[in-house]
Curated annotation (Swiss-Prot):
One of its GO terms (molecular function) is ribosome binding. InterPro entries: PRC_barrel-like_sf, PRC_RimM, RimM, RimM_N, RimM_N_sf, Transl_B-barrel_sf. The PRC barrel domain binds ribosomal protein uS19. Residues 1-29 are annotated as: Disordered. This is Ribosome maturation factor RimM. GO terms for cellular component: cytoplasm; ribosome. It is found in: Cytoplasm. Binds ribosomal protein uS19. One of its GO terms (biological process) is ribosomal small subunit biogenesis. Keywords: Chaperone, Cytoplasm, Ribosome biogenesis, rRNA processing. An accessory protein needed during the final step in the assembly of 30S ribosomal subunit, possibly for assembly of the head region. Essential for efficient processing of 16S rRNA. May be needed both before and after RbfA during the maturation of 16S rRNA. It has affinity for free ribosomal 30S subunits but not for 70S ribosomes. Belongs to the RimM family. Residues 150-231 form the PRC barrel domain. It comes from Paraburkholderia phymatum (strain DSM 17167 / CIP 108236 / LMG 21445 / STM815) (Burkholderia phymatum).
Length: 231
């Protein structure tokens, strides 16, 4: 997430500038009963599969390991809590994908643990079940992201927007955002011609701060900036 200053989900907020218009364990043989119970739970967790995949699913992290012995998983979030990773802490249902396999599972509880997030998922009753989920990418619905403050934006909502300057000159589309530690930077791509006369993809980097970013119109899918085409 980025603040037009500040994360696949960051958010952004522009820093105000004076006069700026825009605000911005070991092997153990398990009892048959437990094995059957785990199988039933796993089947239930797969009940909601690709058919129920939400149209606004956003990838927010990946399951990298099991955590503890009680079925918790460890997730490497694509953004820190407070920068889009907080969606993993607030949403009650996750969608998981690995290769062509897709499934949905309730997130019973989650919390920050060091530089990762750990969570207890429905149908994942022990460490073996949690280990089986390693490598799955985690998605949540965009509509379930935490609400932002005024003039704050999730990066996922900015990618793909057209960028034009105040003179109406088209500068390209937002391809990505970069966090340089001090602020967010729009990485804009546009069609260009290389020195050999062949088509290439040009790049512009515009700091996402109020002195340059004047308007973010998500309805019109457009960002207006104070930036010249030859900068």
């Amino acid at each position: 997430m980025s603040e037009r200053d500040s994360g696949s989900s960051g958010r952004a907020k522009a820093k105000r500038q004076p006069g700026a218009k825009a605000p911005f364990g070991p092997f153990v043989r398990k009892p048959v009963e437990k094995v059957e119970a785990n199988a039933a739970a796993a089947q239930k967790a797969r009940a909601e599969s690709a058919e129920s995949w939400p149209d606004d699913a956003v990838e927010v992290g990946a399951i990298v390991d099991a955590y503890g012995l009680k079925g918790w998983v460890k997730v490497a979030a694509h953004a820190d809590a407070g920068h889009g990773g907080d969606a993993l802490l607030s949403t009650k249902r996750w969608w998981l994908e690995k290769g062509r396999e897709r499934q949905s599972t309730p997130c019973l509880q989650s919390k920050v643990h060091g530089d990762s997030i750990v969570a207890q998922l429905g149908g994942t009753a022990d460490r073996d079940a949690a280990l089986a989920l390693r490598g799955h990418r985690v998605y949540v619905r965009r509509r379930d992201f935490p609400a932002l403050g005024t003039d704050e934006y999730y990066w996922v909502d900015l990618v793909g927007l057209d960028v034009v300057n105040e003179a109406g000159i088209e500068l390209g589309k937002v391809a990505d955002l970069i966090d340089n530690g001090a602020q967010s930077v729009l990485r804009i791509e546009y069609p260009a011609i290389g020195k050999d006369g062949k088509p290439v993809i040009g790049e512009r980097l515009i700091p996402f701060v109020g002195v340059y970013v004047k308007t973010v119109d998500q309805a019109a899918k457009k960002i207006i900036v104070d930036w010249e085409a030859d900068y």
